[in-house]
A protein has these predicted regions:
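Residue-level signature of catalytic and energy-coupling elements of molecular machines
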Residues: 10, 44, 68
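Short amphipathic alpha-helical "recognition" segments used for binding
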Residues: 18-20, 58, 69
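N-terminal intrinsically disordered, cationic/polar leader segments
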Residues: 29-50
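Stable alpha-helical structural segments in soluble proteins, enriched in small hydrophobic residues
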Residues: 67, 71-82
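Long amphipathic alpha-helical segments used for membrane anchoring, targeting, substrate engagement
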Residues: 1-30, 78-98
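A short interface-forming secondary-structure element
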Residues: 49-61
């Protein structure tokens, strides 16, 4: 393969990667833990926290905090998983590129 063809191929791959990354960034991911639900953008920006109030007593504040953390962390894992699924073919498993 000559240098020009390699450059064209690299540009094509870069374009595909950027498109896949943009798709992930614009997607809304949802996570939940017991009576807490969250929505987060693919950029890992938290956009919504929903709490089912009927299940919450005033004394359950600490548990609520834990449930929010779990829901957020689960959603971040989903975003990371989808990012790896969509972009892993370009990075050959090299972590941290996106």
């Amino acid at each position: 393969m000559n240098m020009q063809a390699m450059l064209k191929q690299a540009q094509k791959i870069q374009k595909e990667m950027m498109s896949a990354k943009e798709e992930i960034d614009n997607k809304i991911f949802e996570g939940s833990s017991s009576f807490v639900k969250i929505k987060m953008k693919g950029t890992k920006e938290l956009v919504e926290v929903l709490i089912e109030k009927e299940n919450l007593d005033a004394e359950e504040t600490e548990m609520l905090q834990d449930m929010i953390i779990i829901a957020i962390n689960n959603t971040i894992k989903d975003i990371d998983k989808e990012t790896e699924n969509k972009l892993g073919k370009y990075t050959n498993g090299m972590p941290g590129l996106f």
